[in-house]
Amino acid sequence: LSSGKKYLFGVFGIGSESYRIENKRTGWTAEEKTEIDNRQAEDQRVIDEAIRKKREQATQRAASMWNSVATQHSVAADHPYVQKKKIKPAGARQLGGSILIPLNKFTDSGISLVGLQTIAEAEEDDGSKSISKKFLYGSETKGSWALIGQITEKTEIVYLCEGWATGCSVYEAVKLPVVVAFSAGNLEPVLAEFKKKYPDIFFIIAADNDCHYADRLQADVKSRLNYELRIFAQRSSSRIQYVDTPEGQVSIEAYWGEKDGETCVYYAEKHPGQKQFGRRTLLNIGVAKAKAAARQTAAKVICPKFAEPKNGGTDFNDLAAEEGIEVVRNQLDSTKAAFIEFDKGSKKSSPENKSKNVSDLEKEKEKIKKIINEL
């Protein structure tokens, strides 16, 4: 600042593992506060302009790549990712060795392509093969979606899911439109836009059941620190775990808790030389975000149920790969059938049909609502 003082603000970290940094607003003169506000506003303007340019470039490049492929549904059945996921590819195109999945947004002029997700086989340093999934640099991901199938005037039910492979499996199973939101955190903004566009459609979220988060945490600690992590029932200073490493003693805190109505694990880790614990919260993010989105839009949530949960499957694509597409169809049809019954009940209560007592109809509708909620 002009006074010589320093004021720190911003965000440190990547994605969800980020932390806001900002000085307290006390102890500053009116002139200093004004200078701080002006500096923050100017920095934000510069950032917003840089983001706008990146998104504009991404939109142009995405259109060029997408339009260079003659037809949709051109993804080869022998593509490594298609083979790995055991899917019938839909709603995407292939350019060379890369699968192109469109990132669309609703705009005043209709639907606009704003970016791409690319999926391709990559070679590691040791010569092994892996699958690389990336968003085209600068793509606007928040609120962006891909659609498998078509929404028409006759469409009554639309499914929503996180990933493209899951979307392909759901579409193959139910033959109804599927919206791909690309991430758990994007379910809510995408569903809000679709509900605004199609208020009369019934939306079902085919959620990822990320129930293995505690197992993954314990496996991560084991691989990094060679330590069998214990997760306690509640927080207690007497239950801090100490791990001896070549760099010194690492302090760990892990206990069960609740966040936004969902069970979670609170985890903290402090290494030699660190003044504070680095903290994070682990939970079934797929279910938590799906429920949050459903609450805002009166949608319903269904999670895959596995015969062998220990295999580590989380989504409906995993279910299809492990147990077959018929199992996926049966699980999803249970929710679809409940909606159809509810819709029939609603039509019977119309003014044109008064052959049934209104109170009986209301009881029937409430019964069907209960069926849907229990799925």
Give the positions of each predicted feature.
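Broad, structure-driven detector of short, well-ordered beta-strand segments within folded domains
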Residues: 1, 146, 252-254
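Non-catalytic accessory segments of DNA primases and related replication-initiation nucleases
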Residues: 1-81, 210-212, 218, 344
